[in-house]
Amino acid sequence: MFRLFPLLLTASVLSACGHGDGSGIPQNAALEPTLASIQANVFTPTCAITGCHGGVATQAALHLDPGFSYSNLVGVPSSQGPNLTRVVSGDPNNSLIIHKLEETTPPVGAQMPWGGPYLPQSTIDVIRQWIANGAPDS
């Protein structure tokens, strides 16, 4: 039984992360390229869920609950690859978050949200614009 516990724990965490399918994004929300809008309409309902990037134990040491996102993203090296930066202010093409959201085979890990369905390109474009605007903490 004790040998199965780590396997069961891993399976439950990974299955929980598969629920970041974008279904929590308010369909009529006017998503703006600001951290406040992205937090309320993308990170909180889609990413900051227990077992993924919310709560006490977060995947890849990335905490995306309100009040934590900015300090965990902008200018922060990835725990999966220290030569990769989660958000490079002003440079969405070199920001790992964009690679993780757009690519089926990102430089490290898997495409997010884990297991899909994935965010619509229009939502990712708003995140790109926020980063291109300097990724301000607003």
Predicted regions and their residues:
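C-terminal motif of bacterial Sec signal peptides marking the signal peptidase cleavage site
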Residues: 13-16
